[in-house]
Amino acid sequence: MLNKRLTIQLPFYATQTASSSRFWRVLSPKSRTGIALYASLILLCIFFTIFSTMSHPSLQCFSPTSLVGAQPLKNLTHLIIVAGHAVWLGGSTNGEDDSEWILEPYQKGEGKVFAQHVRSGLDLLSQDDSSLLVFSGGQTRNGAGPSSEAQSYYSLSMQINSDEGLAARRTTEEFARDSLENVLFSVARFYEVTSRYPQKITVVSFDFKRDRFLNLHRKAIKFPEHKFHFVGIDPEGGVSDATREAERKNAIIPFTEDPYACSNPLLVKKRMERNPFRRQHSYLITCPELIPLLQYCPSDPSKFFNGKLPW
């Protein structure tokens, strides 16, 4: 009785040997190692695919690509920028009368000055066969609908002078919301048209903004001082002390403290207000060399970009 062996009957499923285990036992050690490595490789590929498709703040949601279109004007080297300030509605006075413009209250009487800026750009264009004239300015005015400053300036320029040869060397940059973007985005637009970056830049704007363009925006894009020029045209009779003080308070000081308009409340607010139709440029795609500069917003907002640029 004491020598009788105790037998425990296990459930049927517990006594079965998995077919996969039998398969594994019949394999040679070398085959097992190969299968394990292959399975590990598959898992790594799956993990990499999942990780690469996840959303990361530092990753771009686009890929730089080449433009498909007309042949680039590779013989052009001189960028002429006419910075937009308002939207021209059209009319028989060629912009000389304020009624042809959508103006802010403080711009009263300046319509003819904007027309002079356009004429100056055309004069510079006609004097240099290697130049490209870019009218810069976005869809900044609610009252104008989705019509850009740049397109209206271009239309005015064609009404003033529709010469075919000159028309082929003028274009628009339709996303700028402030004077820094007038410069930087026009450089990007120049590249889109020519497949190269400018060797020389000339900006046409108000003369009282000279310091802003020459000493702040030029420095912000690291363009050589001796290759950057400015043509200033103010209203007849000059500008008031109040205008100069407004320039100092609303532009010189803010852009000195924050050259790229990343965090200064006044500059940030202006950009938001000047984009009522929520437009976004494509220069991050078409101008990959400019991505670091276009996205530059340092922790110290007064710090200038010191990376490598194609000029």
UniProtKB/Swiss-Prot annotation:
One of its GO terms (cellular component) is cytoplasm. The keyword Lipid biosynthesis does not apply. Its main location: membrane. It is found in: Membrane. Coiled coil: none annotated. The chain crosses the membrane at residues 34-54, 76-96. One of its GO terms (molecular function) is catalytic activity. It is a multi-pass membrane protein. Keywords: Membrane, Transmembrane, Transmembrane helix. To yeast YOR238w. PANTHER family: TRANSMEMBRANE PROTEIN. This is Uncharacterized protein C57A10.07. It comes from Schizosaccharomyces pombe (strain 972 / ATCC 24843) (Fission yeast).
